[in-house]
């Protein structure tokens, strides 16, 4: 096939040649893949454990005669129950509450994380 370009070389030249000057030996433009069929619908269990228990404690005060606060029902570390904040505030709170009971290596790593986050929050951010 003397005098004609290979398919790959012609494909590369498509973008370089202006639209009005293109000839047929460069080939046709690549047609984007068009999906003809729809994917099968996913089967979702609407009553799994997580979805079934969503919002179960929302009105515990109304039904439970206001004896328990919803934060008392949260399971997790003591320094995180019913509290929200960023990572630096969370680490400082953890150090304040359980720092005296931590292993030396864990406390050292926590102090390193606090110093890094302190520098990070003071050097970068929206109001700098």
Swiss-Prot record:
Keyword RNA-binding annotated: no
InterPro entries reported in the protein's UniProt record: Ribosomal_mL51
Keyword vocabulary terms for this entry: Mitochondrion, Ribonucleoprotein, Ribosomal protein, Transit peptide
Any single GO BP term: mitochondrial translation
GO MF annotations, alphabetized: structural constituent of ribosome
Residues annotated as transit peptide in the record: 1-31
Tagged with keyword rRNA-binding: no
Highest taxon above the source species: Eukaryota
Intracellular or extracellular location(s): Mitochondrion
One Pfam family here: MRP-L51
GO cellular component: mitochondrial inner membrane; mitochondrial large ribosomal subunit; mitochondrial ribosome
Assembly and binders: Component of the mitochondrial ribosome large subunit (39S) which comprises a 16S rRNA and about 50 distinct proteins. Interacts with OXA1L.
Family: Belongs to the mitochondrion-specific ribosomal protein mL51 family.
Name of the featured protein: Large ribosomal subunit protein mL51
């Amino acid at each position: 096939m003397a005098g004609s370009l290979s398919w790959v070389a012609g494909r590369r030249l498509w973008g370089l040649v202006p639209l009005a000057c293109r000839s047929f030996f460069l080939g046709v433009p690549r047609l984007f893949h068009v999906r003809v069929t729809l994917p099968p619908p996913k089967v979702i269990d609407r009553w799994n454990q997580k979805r079934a228990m969503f919002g179960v404690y929302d009105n515990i005060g109304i039904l439970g005669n206001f004896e328990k606060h919803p934060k008392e029902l949260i399971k997790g570390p003591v320094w995180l129950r019913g509290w929200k904040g960023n990572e630096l505030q969370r680490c400082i709170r953890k150090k304040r509450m359980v720092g005296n009971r931590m292993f030396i290596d864990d406390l050292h790593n926590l102090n390193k994380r606090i110093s890094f986050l302190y520098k990070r929050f003071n050097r970068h951010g929206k109001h700098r």
